[in-house]
Curated annotation (Swiss-Prot):
A GO MF term: 5'-3' RNA polymerase activity
Record-linked Gene3D superfamilies: Trypsin-like serine proteases (2.40.10.10)
Coiled-coil regions, chain positions: 131-218
Matching Pfam families: Astro_VPg, Trypsin_2
Keywords: Coiled coil, Covalent protein-RNA linkage, Host membrane, Hydrolase, Membrane, Phosphoprotein, Protease, Serine protease, Transmembrane, Transmembrane helix, Viral RNA replication
UniProt modified residues of type O-(5'-phospho-RNA)-tyrosine: 834
Organism this protein belongs to: Turkey astrovirus 2 (TAstV-2)
Active site, per annotation: 600 (charge relay system), 632 (charge relay system), 697 (charge relay system)
The reaction(s) this protein catalyses: RNA(n) + a ribonucleoside 5'-triphosphate = RNA(n+1) + diphosphate
Name of the molecule in the record: Non-structural polyprotein 1A
Phosphoprotein is among the record's keywords: yes
Record lineage: Viruses, Riboviria, Orthornavirae, Pisuviricota, Stelpaviricetes
Keyword Protein transport in record: no
GO CC, any one term: host cell membrane
Length: 1125
């Protein structure tokens, strides 16, 4: 039994050894590629079985092994299927019996390929979510960039408007300066005219004085002559006169008016014995004299000498300071009665009878005071003081505690004759602790500051020791308030004692002040309004009134300023066309999808000619729109497709008299012309002073926003006539109102939308959190720096998007459009099209030119559709080459890192010998196949060249044997064919400073020499003996039997699969994403894709009619087809 047990243990160890060998045999199989004969076998089988169901089922497998022309094995999951074709036309597929027909080595290769495919799928699923996040971030970056561009455009517009305003201000300033210069010139001219006129008048005055002097001399001579004749007459006839013939009759009185006396001197007035009078005038005399006026204040009386000094020049004298009797007595005492007679009238010749404005005001105040006194007397006749005192007494008696507290103070106030009411107010307001201080203040009012300080100290200490917790701070603050109030009360008490205010006056003043304070506080309070969206707004009653007043003032100022400044108006030359009818030519403009013009332009014509630039088309007159109070109408023409480039004009929102712009053509209809000015709107009529010509009829009037106001009809005299058509167009082109479904609850609908948004948002956040956890888990698995970099390359970023590369730096900036290099690498022909061109005899150069022409056309179409500027795309080829080079370096780095880890990495394509920088030896005969591949570091290139020369001999290969030897270094590339290769001399070269050496056995023997900084030299050798029905591979492992002499199939690259639909067929991935990506649907209030369709049935809620799309449902509702609506 012991021996049996030992033998059993021995067999168990053999089984374990066999399992370890199988595992070692499978390690690295996913990197193995089999070249010989597989492509030809695959093409033959595809041509023979390509359209059969069995071949289709075989192609769906994850890994495929082609044994011969009739037999193949496919692996999908854990199932091994068998493809067998006993006849070419009848192949069969068995999904579960393939494992019985393959060897252990073949099964290991299939398992490795299947595992590689599953790992690739897992990697794609892991990265799909991260790629989606990157795309979303890119979209948000695009939106932010567009917003920034819009803000920049708005800033540019503001800058342009500021520049235009600055130019207008400068122009206005120049105009004002020119106007002021003209006025200054006119003023100087008038001044010179006046100077000349004054000089002429002075000359005339001198001439007149000379003439007057001459006349005076003549009069003096005549007077002397007359005096001589009088003396002679007295001597001759003197004796004849009688002594008693004296004439005692008094002279007759001569009445002289004050106006006449003003122009007569004193001597003449005394000669004719006329009494002087003062003139009733408030104007100062021209040379000297005072004006007597009434004053409202009493002033000091003036003396006669002061009056003479004051009235030596024009001045004013008040009636209160002027006492004519006293002044006359002073004058007689000084100068005598004869000299003083009439002197006061000479000094004060004028008297002002008007009253001063302040006198009128004082009289009004006196009248008001009399009325108030009268009313107060009437009120006091009803004995209201008794009623007020009684009410105050009842109020005090209503609270017995306060009454007992106030009683001593009321008695003291009555005894000391101080205001009782103010004392009661103090006792009621201040705390009990302050009552002794109030009593002390009543007796000793002069110690108010000391008393207030002691009160503050007492209240503060009381608050600190008698209160607890947060109440201490509140009580201390109250102590300060009570102290300030105590000082104010003391001052009020002193004022009341001084003015001797009665109790009634005290009560009335207290009630009025309290009501005013409370009312003002209520008017200034702030009202907080909370809106349904959660925002709050604060308003004040006074602020609201103030804002209303300010807004009204702004409106008035804006109205006053509107007429003075001509605003900038958008040009509407791109919206007008020339309209030619039978009876004349005019102007038309586009409104919506119609051309409008005046009716008299196309009168008598059913079809008119429309011209815009070089385009001339015919259009039919659809209808006319009548205008109220106008003999002319508006003609409506159909918009031809050729004039779709004409821009439409929108209706004005507000119609009022303003600066408007008329857009028309010159008389020759060659260029557009605009007229801008003030237009007066009177009802429907529009009047202006534009210099319009014949042919401007039908032109549009637009406001400063470029919106349509009216249409031009013609010229009446010097005024242009237009008509306002805003209301007429609104009534004619009414929009159809959309009906709301019956029993539709908007609030419930909004609640569903909000709830759905919250649910979808929560799901997105949950999925995002799960993805973050997975990424963090992958990061933790990275042990070394190479592992971390590798994970970052595969899972963290898209390939080539690292910041250390050129493509990574390009990735930092959001790419707004594709480059030309993308299109110049695009595949334009399918395999069938390419094959057809070859069959038709096209050469390779002709096919290449045709493909390049298609690529150029695709690039131009892309630029036109996406508004991309192709300027600067001349260097697209250099950029494409540089990008490919950088991507190739990244691929090589990833491959090396993954080979070091012993993990799978799917290559994009096979690398050439030059790109690999290595030595590759291949020799194949009918009996044997040998390969050797050696990759070394740069410092071992010289040793690699010597080894290549030793391995490649000068002997030619025998018939039936093929050999290829390739060497690729930085400075040398060699390719030798048809020479015998000595594989025994192909050995691995140790790397400088070798740390360790590894040998990985298997079907291909791999030797790795590792040095510092993870530098490696790798040698891979394989020797396969081909016999009939058996393939022997020399390595450190046992030979593996193969039942077929066909070479192993090459590892095929998996086609790209769409992450939205899973199909590997070429199609529009963007459209596929648009159809299958889930979005929030407002109609269904849920998340779904367009491919899934709407969750909520699309039907009319009124008539229950179903529709295939929401657009048809909207048409059904808007067009009024629903009979129940």
């Amino acid at each position: 039994m012991a021996q049996a047990g030992r033998s059993g243990d021995a067999f168990a160890s053999l089984d374990q050894r066999r399992e370890r060998q199988e595992e070692q045999a499978q390690s690295g199989l996913d990197k193995v590629f089999y070249f010989q004969g597989v492509v030809e076998l695959f093409n033959r089988m595809k041509i023979a079985y390509g359209r059969t169901p069995a071949w289709t089922a075989l192609m769906k497998c994850n890994a495929i092994y082609l044994k011969d022309f009739k037999t193949a094995v496919g692996v999908e999951g854990t199932r091994y299927g068998l493809f067998f074709a006993e006849e070419v036309t009848k192949p069969t597929w068995s999904p579960d019996i393939g494992a019985n027909l393959i060897t252990l080595g073949e099964k290991a290769c299939l398992d490795a390929q299947n595992a590689k495919y599953e790992r690739l799928q897992a990697s794609l699923k892991t990265t799909s979510g991260l790629v989606h996040q990157v795309m979303e971030k890119t979209r948000e970056a695009k939106e932010n960039l567009e917003k920034a561009n819009k803000i920049q455009e708005q800033l540019d517009k503001v800058i342009e408007s500021n520049k235009a305003l600055h130019r207008k201000i400068q122009e206005r300033n120049r105009e004002k300066m020119q106007e002021y210069m003209v006025r200054l010139h006119n003023t100087q001219k008038d001044r010179d005219d006046w100077v000349q006129r004054c000089s002429r008048l002075e000359q005339e005055n001198v001439t007149l004085q000379k003439r007057l002097k001459e006349k005076e001399n003549a009069l003096v001579s005549v007077g002397w002559d007359l005096l001589g004749w009088i003396v002679i007459s007295v001597l001759v006839f003197g004796l004849i006169s009688l002594a008693d013939a004296q004439n005692l009759t008094p002279p007759a009185k001569i009445v002289i008016t004050p106006g006449q006396a003003e122009f007569m001197d004193l001597a003449k007035l005394e000669k004719i014995q006329v009494r002087k009078y003062r003139l009733d005038s408030c104007e100062l005399p021209p040379e000297k004299g005072c004006v007597l006026y009434k004053d409202y204040l009493t002033t000091r009386p003036v003396s006669f000498l002061e009056l003479m000094a004051k009235c030596s020049k024009p001045d004013w004298v008040s009636e209160s300071s002027y006492n004519e009797t006293t002044l006359m007595e002073e004058c007689i005492q000084i100068f005598g009665a004869e000299w003083c007679e009439g002197k006061l009238v000479d000094l004060v010749p004028r008297k002002c009878g008007e009253q001063h404005v302040l006198v009128n005001i004082i009289e009004q105040i006196e009248k008001t005071r009399e009325v108030v006194t009268l009313i107060y007397g009437k009120v006091m006749s009803y004995r209201l003081d008794m009623w007020i005192t009684s009410i105050f007494s009842l109020v005090l008696a209503g609270n017995k505690e306060k009454l007992f507290k106030m009683a001593p103070f009321i008695f003291v106030a009555w005894f000391l004759n101080i205001p009782v009411f103010l004392t009661c107010v103090a006792v009621n307001i201040f705390p009990v602790v302050s009552l002794p201080f109030i009593l002390f203040q009543i007796f000793m009012p002069q110690f108010v500051l000391v008393n207030a300080f002691l009160l503050w100290l007492t209240l503060t200490l009381t608050a600190f020791y008698w209160s607890e917790g947060p109440k201490i701070l509140m009580e201390i603050s109250y102590a300060l308030v009570y102290t300030i109030g105590f000082v104010l009360w003391s001052l009020g008490l002193a004022v009341g004692v001084t003015l001797k205010l009665t109790m009634v006056h005290q009560i009335l003043m207290f009630c009025v002040v309290a009501a005013a304070i409370c009312g003002t506080k209520f008017a200034c309070t702030t009202i907080t309004v909370q809106h349904p969206d959660g925002t709050t707004a604060k308003y004040t009653r006074v602020g609201k009134l103030k804002n209303n007043v300010v807004n009204q003032c702004k409106k008035v100022v804006t109205t006053l300023q509107t007429r003075g400044v001509i605003p900038a108006t958008p040009a509407k030359t791109a919206s007008i066309v020339i309209v030619e009818g039978k009876n004349g030519t005019g102007v038309g403009f586009r409104f919506m999808n119609y051309i409008l013009t005046a009716e008299h332009v196309v009168q008598g014509s059913d079809i008119a000619t429309l011209k815009n630039g070089s385009v001339s088309v015919k259009s039919k007159v659809i209808k006319t729109i009548p205008i109220f109070e106008s003999v002319d109408n508006v003609a409506v023409l159909k918009l031809p497709p050729e004039l779709n480039s004409v821009k439409p004009i929108k209706l004005a929102k507000k119609v009022q008299s303003d600066y408007l712009t008329l857009t028309a053509y010159d008389p020759n209809f060659q260029h557009a012309a605009t007229f801008t000015g003030w237009c007066i709107i009177d009802g429907n009529w529009l009047n202006n002073s534009f210099d319009t010509k014949f042919g401007n009829s039908g032109a549009p009037y637009c406001d400063h926003d470029g919106r349509l106001v009216g249409i031009h009809l013609g010229t009446q005299g010097v005024l242009s006539q237009g008509i306002v058509i805003v209301d007429a167009l609104k009534n004619t082109f009414q929009l159809a109102d959309q009906c709301r479904p019956q029993n539709f609850d908007m609030d419930e609908f909004l609640e569903k939308v909000i709830a759905g948004t919250k649910v979808s948002h929560a799901a997105i956040l949950k999925e995002l959190e799960e993805l973050r956890e997975e990424v963090q888990f992958l990061k933790k698995k990275c042990v070394t720096y190479d592992d971390y970099w590798l994970c970052q390359t595969i899972f963290g970023q898209a390939k080539g998007k690292t910041k250390k590369t050129v493509r990574g730096r390009k990735h930092l900036v959001t790419k707004r459009a594709l480059g030309k290099g993308h299109f110049m690498k695009m595949r334009m022909l399918t395999d069938e099209e390419y094959q057809n061109m070859i069959e038709k005899g096209f050469s390779a150069e002709e096919i290449r030119e045709a493909v390049n022409a298609l690529r150029e056309q695709a690039w131009l179409n892309y630029c036109i559709d996406n508004d991309v500027d192709d300027e600067g795309e001349e260097d697209w080829y250099d950029d494409m080459v540089e990008t490919d080079r950088v991507n190739q370096e990244i691929d090589e780095a990833i491959e090396r890192a993954m080979e070091d880890r012993g993990e799978f990495y799917q290559k994009k394509s096979r690398l050439t010998f030059v790109e690999q920088a290595m030595m590759h030896l291949i020799q194949v005969s009918k009996e044997r196949s040998q390969t050797a591949k050696l990759e070394v570091q740069k410092e071992n290139e010289a040793q690699l060249v010597k080894m290549f020369e030793r391995c490649v001999t000068d002997e030619n290969t025998p018939e039936g044997t093929t050999s290829i030897a390739a060497l690729s270094t930085e400075d040398d590339v060699r390719l030798v064919e048809g020479k015998v290769i000595d594989f025994t001399k192909a050995k691995n070269i140790p790397v400088d400073g070798e740390i360790r050496r590894e040998i990985i056995p298997g079907t291909k023997c791999t030797e790795i020499s590792t040095g510092p900084e993870n530098k490696k030299n790798i040698l891979k050798k394989k020797d396969t003996h081909i016999a009939e029905g058996k393939v022997e591979t020399k390595s450190s492992q046992q030979p593996v039997d193969v039942k077929d002499d066909k070479p192993v199939a090459l590892e095929q690259r998996k086609p790209r699969a769409c992450k939205w639909c899973g199909s590997s067929q070429k199609h529009d991935y963007r459209e596929c994403r648009f159809q299958r990506e889930k979005r929030f649907c407002v109609y269904c209030a849920a998340m779904h894709s367009m491919f899934e369709g709407h969750i909520r049935p699309i039907e009319c809620t009124s008539c229950k009619k179903s529709f295939s799309g929401i657009e048809k449902l909207e048409d059904h509702v808007v067009s009024g087809e629903c009979q129940k609506n």
